[in-house]
């Protein structure tokens, strides 16, 4: 059952007030936060004031929208006017934006109530939320393990029941991988479907904002609220936005069977056998539900990872040049001159992973290496997109595991960057191609840790992804399981 619709019905029936819902939400956050550490900032005072306004509307007999009075968690790389936005970096400690990001503005206008800003890997660079400059978030299913990253705080907040819905950003898997590890639904929309205005940039040709929720229906409702053209974002698509939640049907289409392609290259070396088994069982279940399944080859899929780790750091090195303590950044006052101020500020403010990616990007963009690395990576990106185009000429949806493994122990991969990068092996090619993809729960391993499967769609086919995911979700009970904190 949709948490949004349940809360909405309770509000309009006056079974619960918005203030009661928010008060209970913050009580739960205060109870579990010492273990989970999903939030960097809580906005209790502002949230309760907004809730009181919703209650006043209801008392006056006014109609309220579906998201009015609904608590939401926001990743701390989305600018929120008057509320600290740190990107989990010490260099932005105390930074308070003077403007609102488009997505948070749209949610405010829809009446959703932000309960706080969630933790992430610094500047969204990471796959475990261990790169935060402030705290390490725990996975609600086992707090000694990571929630995934970089949107680990948002995924953990939804899994732990601290908010029914949340926003994250996805550059190479940063919504889908934590959704998989935390046992929730996470969707990366088509590049350009959701405005990036007010999202602190990591890799501008890859970044995209998307929703987290416990159910597919809530994911669809949240996507409806944030999708749409925005003149403030030059990459924003000017397309009609469907009512995704209204299009969800209880069954797959009967007249023209849905064709699902299993990406052959994703079931091989490096994939946890329990993950492979759970996803194969989910595929078999989709067949029983009426889908036609065939194996599809995307031969350049495996080259996504090396191409990404040239393109993304290259864009990051340019985007992060602005943190110089003049325009942005906590200034190092001890510097004797301008160059020292730049150097000392960036050395003290950035964490090791951010420094690693800036250096990598600067190297690949340098005169002697641009053609050998950056240009070649862009050619590989084009070939990956061609592979997807050829696949979608044969099938409607592609399917594969979201992550090669379930949640790993905190600290297990921090000294091995390459091992950490492999966490996004299945998700990165989708960002390079600009396609939509969704992760949803499809089982648990022997240790009780969630397993997610990834559905990939053609450009602007979020409606189809949500439909397939909804039918699978209704036929299974994975989404009903909750962690015991």
From Swiss-Prot:
The active site is at residues 75, 150, 174. Its EC number is 6.3.5.7. It is an enzyme of class 6 (ligase). One of its GO terms (molecular function) is ATP binding. It catalyses: L-glutamyl-tRNA(Gln) + L-glutamine + ATP + H2O = L-glutaminyl-tRNA(Gln) + L-glutamate + ADP + phosphate + H(+). Heterotrimer of A, B and C subunits. This is Glutamyl-tRNA(Gln) amidotransferase subunit A.
């Amino acid at each position: 059952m949709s948490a949004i619709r349940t809360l909405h019905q309770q509000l309009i029936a006056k079974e619960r007030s918005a203030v009661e819902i928010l008060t209970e939400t913050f009580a739960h956050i205060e109870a579990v936060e010492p273990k989970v550490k999903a939030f960097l900032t809580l906005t209790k005072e502002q949230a309760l004031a907004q809730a009181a306004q919703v209650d006043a509307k209801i008392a006056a007999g006014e109609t309220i929208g579906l998201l009015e009075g609904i608590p939401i968690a926001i990743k701390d790389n989305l600018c929120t006017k008057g509320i600290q936005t740190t990107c989990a970096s010490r260099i932005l400690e105390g930074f308070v934006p003077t403007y609102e990001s488009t997505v948070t503005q749209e949610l405010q206008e829809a009446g959703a109530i932000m309960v706080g800003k969630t933790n992430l890997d610094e500047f969204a660079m990471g796959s475990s939320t261990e790169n935060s400059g402030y705290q390490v978030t725990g996975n609600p299913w086992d707090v000694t393990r990571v929630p995934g990253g970089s949107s680990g705080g948002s995924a953990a907040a939804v899994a732990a029941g601290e908010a029914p819905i949340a926003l994250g950003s996805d550059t190479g898997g940063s919504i889908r991988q934590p959704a998989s590890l935390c046992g929730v639904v996470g969707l990366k929309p088509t590049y350009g479907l959701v405005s990036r205005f007010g999202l602190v940039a990591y890799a501008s040709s890859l970044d995209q904002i998307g929703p987290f929720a416990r159910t597919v229906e809530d994911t669809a409702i949240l996507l409806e609220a944030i999708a749409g053209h925005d003149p403030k974002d030059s990459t924003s698509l000017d397309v009609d936005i469907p009512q995704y939640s209204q299009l969800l049907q209880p069954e797959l289409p009967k007249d023209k069977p849905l064709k699902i392609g299993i990406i052959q290259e994703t079931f091989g070396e490096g994939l946890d056998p329990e993950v492979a088994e759970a996803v194969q069982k989910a595929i078999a279940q989709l067949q029983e539900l009426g889908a036609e399944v065939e194996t599809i080859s995307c031969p350049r899929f495996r080259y996504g990872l090396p191409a990404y780790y040239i393109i993304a750091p290259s864009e990051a090195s340019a985007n992060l040049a602005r943190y110089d303590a003049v325009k942005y950044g906590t200034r190092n006052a001890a510097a004797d001159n301008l160059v020292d101020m730049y150097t000392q500020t960036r050395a003290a403010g950035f964490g090791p992973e951010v420094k690693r990616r800036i250096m990598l990007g600067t190297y690949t963009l340098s005169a002697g290496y641009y053609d050998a690395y950056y240009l070649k990576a862009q050619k590989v990106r084009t070939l990956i997109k061609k592979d997807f185009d050829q696949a979608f000429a044969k099938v409607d949806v592609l399917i594969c595991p979201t992550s090669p493994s379930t949640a790993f122990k905190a600290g297990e991969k921090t000294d091995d960057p390459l091992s950490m990068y492999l966490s996004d092996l299945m998700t990165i090619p989708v960002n390079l191609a600009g396609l939509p993809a969704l992760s949803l729960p499809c089982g648990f391993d022997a240790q009780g840790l969630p397993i997610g499967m990834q559905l990939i769609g053609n450009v602007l086919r979020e409606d189809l992804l949500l439909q397939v995911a909804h039918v699978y979700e209704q036929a299974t009970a994975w989404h009903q399981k909750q962690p015991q904190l």
